[in-house]
Every structure is written in C-alpha cells, then in structure tokens.
A protein has these predicted regions:
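Conserved alpha/beta-hydrolase "acid-adjacent" motif
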Residues: 79-85
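Histidine-centered active-site/metal-ligand motif
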Residues: 74, 85, 106
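Catalytic histidine-centered segment of alpha/beta-hydrolase-like enzymes
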Residues: 98-112
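Short beta-strand/loop motif that positions the catalytic acidic residue
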Residues: 66, 72-74, 78
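Alpha/beta-hydrolase
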Residues: 1-61, 68, 88
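Solvent-exposed polar/charged
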Residues: 64, 91-92
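Hydrophobic/aromatic residue at the end of a short beta strand that borders the catalytic acidic motif
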Residues: 14, 81, 108
Length: 112
C-alpha cells in the first residue's frame, strides 16, 4: 500500500480472514495497527515478509537443536496455520510444552 492509512485499512480487512470472529474489533484493530505503523511503516513490507516466509527452508533441524525451555502456544481455531503446525513444532523441540487455546485463532488477542 502507498500510504500508512491505506495499509492500516488493508491490515484490518486482512485480519478478518484469520481472526476469531468473536474477538474481531475494528476500533481496537485500527488503534493497534496505527500504533504499529507509527513506529515503523514500511510500504510493501508485509508482502516482502510473506515472500520471505514462503521461501524459507525447513526449520526442522533448527527446532530440533534448541536447548531452552519452550512453550508453544497455538489456537485451536487457527485458520492460517492449523493446530497441527503447533503440535509439530512442539514435537520437534526437545522438552517443549504445548498450550492449545480453545477458541483462539491465529491472532493472539487481549481476551486470552
């Protein structure tokens, strides 16, 4: 998007695709994204981040090599990355614990 205002509105619309409908609050999201972009607005940054994520090689070896206490938190209703992704991540990290949050989607919201 060309302007910060356009990006904020786009972020609000996009968030609706994978947000928990019970916790989707346009005013709260507008405030959140405004604060976020006032700190660091980078036109096109979201698309570059998405492209980088899609081109990243497997993280399996890196996860298996972790040697720190780890809690994987994942929403059971995540439509962007299914709960299986969270389970697999916890399975790959030695000694990791998994916290599956009932009713939560991909967004980590204040209500949780």
């Amino acid at each position: 998007k060309e302007t910060m205002e356009e990006q904020i509105e786009s972020d609000i619309v996009t968030r609706k695709l994978w947000a928990n409908p019970d916790w989707y609050d346009v005013d709260q999201l507008r405030e959140f994204f405004t604060e976020l972009h006032e700190r660091a607005f980078v036109p096109g940054g979201g698309m570059r981040q998405f492209g980088a994520a899609m081109r990243t090689p497997s993280r399996v070896e890196g996860l298996q090599a972790l040697d720190i206490p780890t809690l994987v938190v994942h929403g059971e209703n995540d439509t962007l990355l299914s709960i299986e992704h969270g389970r697999r991540t916890a399975e790959l990290i030695p000694g990791a614990e998994l916290l599956e949050i009932e009713g939560m989607s991909h967004d980590f919201v204040y209500q949780v």
